[in-house]
């Protein structure tokens, strides 16, 4: 980068810084108009300031840095502070006509003693710039990039790294500068110095399952069944023997006597009744004796 391109690079940074201060309400827009009216870009063809394309890792020649970092990282510099002080003094009623700085190649315009003291006193009265909110760390996805070249990180807030290191991307500040983390350190780095890894979209891991409580194992079904103590009962008495059925005596045929034989008929009746009584008494006595013997 030659001297003219470097001056244009610094002037563009001043424009960006003052635009940020105007948006935050620190200075009036008239100060920004004064900067545009009095600080011009250098004439002549200027090389493009866009970020160059990334080269393979094997190349040892580092790429030129892209355009100036975000205005959040680099606030108003020495030249911006001087112009802001002059703008504030004009708004407070103190009219001054700034002199046109001499355009010397490689040498900035010198400041007078009174102007330097005025700048110091005015900068002390300026309110501090608002703090830049930190990156949102609650990412569902994490981007990882691979460093293609060595980046020393010359400025405060830069994230230095070496070629081959893996960086976690926290925020895309703009198209040219990203914010990342490496070895516990956060900072910004040029996006054309790194290459996005294919497996960078790593989803957040689900929370681990709750610890399981250890319960005693259930009793196996093959265990022997529980034995119950049976109550001993007194032995039962032997059942009574069944009563033997004795065959009945065949019924005697009834003889019908003729009416003429009256005497024989009555005799046969007496004999038949006697035999029946004897049979009944004998059968009953035998059954009764057997029943008494079985009981005792």
Swiss-Prot record:
Residues 46-138, 202-246 are annotated as: Disordered. Residues 111-124 have a biased composition (Polar residues). The keyword Zinc-finger does not apply. Disulfide bonds: none annotated. Keywords: SH3 domain. Residues 215-235 have a biased composition (Low complexity). Residues 205-214 have a biased composition (Pro residues). Residues 93-103 have a biased composition (Basic and acidic residues). GO terms for biological process: actin cytoskeleton organization; endocytosis. Pfam families: SH3_1. It comes from the Eukaryota. Residues 140-199 form the SH3 domain. SUPFAM superfamilies: SH3-domain (SSF50044). This is Protein csh3. It comes from Schizosaccharomyces pombe (strain 972 / ATCC 24843) (Fission yeast).
């Amino acid at each position: 980068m030659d001297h003219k391109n470097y001056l244009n690079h610094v002037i563009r940074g001043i424009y960006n810084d003052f635009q940020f201060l105007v948006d935050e309400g620190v200075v009036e827009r008239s100060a920004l108009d004064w900067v545009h009216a009095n600080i011009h870009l250098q004439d002549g063809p200027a090389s493009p300031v866009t970020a160059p394309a990334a080269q393979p890792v094997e190349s040892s020649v580092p790429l030129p840095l892209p355009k100036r970092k975000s205005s959040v990282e680099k606030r108003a510099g020495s030249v911006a502070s001087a112009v802001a002080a002059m703008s504030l003094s004009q708004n407070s009623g103190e009219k001054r006509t700034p002199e046109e700085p001499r355009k010397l190649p490689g040498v900035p315009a010198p400041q007078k003693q009174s102007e330097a003291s005025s700048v110091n006193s005015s900068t002390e009265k300026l309110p501090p710039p608002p703090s830049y909110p930190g990156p949102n760390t609650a990412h569902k996805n994490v981007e990882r990039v691979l460093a293609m070249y060595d980046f020393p990180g010359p400025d405060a807030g830069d994230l230095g790294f070496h070629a081959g290191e893996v960086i976690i991307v926290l925020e895309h500040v703009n198209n040219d500068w990203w914010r990342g983390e490496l070895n516990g350190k956060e900072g910004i780095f040029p996006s054309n110095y790194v290459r996005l890894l294919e497996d960078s979209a790593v989803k957040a891991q689900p929370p681990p399952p709750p610890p399981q409580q250890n319960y005693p194992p259930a009793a196996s079904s093959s265990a022997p069944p529980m034995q119950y103590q049976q109550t001993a009962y007194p032995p039962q008495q032997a059942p009574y023997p069944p009563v033997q059925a004795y065959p009945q005596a065949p019924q005697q045929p009834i003889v019908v006597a003729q009416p003429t034989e009256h005497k024989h008929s009555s005799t046969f009746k007496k004999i038949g009744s006697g035999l029946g009584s004897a049979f009944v008494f004998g059968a009953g006595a035998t059954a009764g004796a057997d029943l008494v013997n079985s009981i005792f």
